Amino acid sequence: MDTEPAELTVIDPDGLPNVVFRWTPARPPRAAVHVMHGLAEHARRYARLATALNAAGYVVYADDHRGHGETGTRTDSLGDFGPRGMEGVVDAVHAVTERVHSEHPGLPVFALGHSWGSFILYRYLQRYGADLAGALLTGTTHVAPGVEALGNFNAAFQPARTPYDWLSRDEAEVDAYLADPLCGFESVPLRSSPSVDRGASESGDDSTIPHALPVFVFNGAADPIGGAAGGRALADHLLALGLDDVTFRAYPDARHELFNEINRDEVVADVVAWLDARATTKDASGSGSARRANP
């Protein structure tokens, strides 16, 4: 059974309220994980993952990004990322991570981004990478297919039962997505979309990503957004930048939402094993000290 999270509100640098959910383990946490969700979904869809991470000793935070979930609903801004677009979203996410650090001083903080959340996280690494003990990117790619390709994501899964068969082989999970009023581009129309269709490495300055930062890239091999090839290209790109610890895995036949796939237990076990091997008392810079933003 999923644990009911605590609800927080974090005011971002533009003065906008962001709704955040926190799942806390029964014992003192060994590290924190900040989950960044994808487009047209929301943070509480990661409750099952958060419960599993709690059982492994991790406190989990997940915010509803600008224009999404409770953040979008309570400000009547579903689908609207604000006047600064993607950069504003990244700064809002950074404010949440700062809250995590303030609530757990000295604890290593990891970030996990899914799909659009992985693109947010990659830009975050360029600007605030020293904040983190490690990064996990899933449902991701090196060069994004573009928002205009959304209508073609089901092409490989014909005859399709629903417009969202590309999300998962688990029909119950697809049906839950369809039934969720805070999911789907019909419910969350993109009222502003600068940079949402850029791949993980298509903007910003990669030279600012800390070389000591551990990164785990993992995709479903049948994911139409990146799949095995797009994920591998991103991992190879990170290695070419000089990062010391880059792990890549593609799961055969799995689709876009690995945490809602039929092999989700395998995926979660791999995530926990990766985190366990890297959870320390220092951040990725090795200092555990002050954090500085990059332009």
Feature annotation, model-predicted:
Residues 45, 50-76:
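Conserved alpha/beta-hydrolase
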Residues 224-233:
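Conserved alpha/beta-hydrolase "acid-adjacent" motif
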Residues 245-295:
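Catalytic active-site module of serine/aspartate enzymes centered on a nucleophile-bearing elbow/loop
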Residues 1-25:
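N-terminal cap/lid segment of alpha/beta-hydrolase-fold proteins
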Residues 29-38:
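Short beta-strand element of the alpha/beta-hydrolase
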Residues 112-188:
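Alpha/beta-hydrolase-fold enzymes
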Residues 217-219:
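Short beta-strand/loop motif that positions the catalytic acidic residue
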Residues 81-102:
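Alpha/beta-hydrolase active-site loop
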